[in-house]
A protein has these predicted regions:
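Kelch-like beta-propeller repeat domains
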Residues: 1-142
């Protein structure tokens, strides 16, 4: 067990453009990408925003192909991947767990569909090892 201590100060930064919870996030090239999650009254979000800490500004990027939550992001050389998740929840409706896999290209601001997961999953772990994606655990559709 490490006895290392971390000394740092918290600093308030600009709020996200839209209040949300349970979004996915990832740091690429010193910019924070925030995808999906829940907005007003537990409705899934289609938003993708990026925060640049150097300028202190948020920028809205192209909306997701559909509203989504319960995903993880993994980087690659020109963007990031996300897979599975809960789609288009409308309160008090039931979550729709999916098997979709997507790649987002940062330079092109574009999504590309990839082959589906073998089954519907949400909230699991996603990792990229070499050129392969690995999805671990997660909730399964009823």
């Amino acid at each position: 067990m490490s006895n290392a201590s971390h000394n740092f100060d918290w600093q308030q930064l600009p709020d996200m453009p839209v209040a949300k919870w349970e979004p996915a996030s990832l740091l690429i090239n010193n910019k924070l990408y925030v995808l999906g999650g829940y907005e007003n009254y537990i409705m899934s979000s289609r938003r993708l925003d990026v925060f640049d800490p150097e300028s202190g500004h948020w920028t809205k990027l192209q909306d997701l192909p559909s509203a989504l939550s319960h995903v993880n992001l993994v980087p690659d050389r020109n963007g990031f991947w996300f897979a599975g998740g809960m789609k288009d929840k409308i309160h008090p409706g039931k979550d729709h767990i999916i098997s979709e896999v997507w790649h987002y290209d940062i330079d092109l601001d574009r999504y590309t569909a990839a082959p589906l997961l073998p089954g519907h999953r949400a909230g699991g772990g996603l990792a990229r090892i070499g050129n392969n994606l690995h999805y671990v655990s997660g909730l399964m559709a009823d």
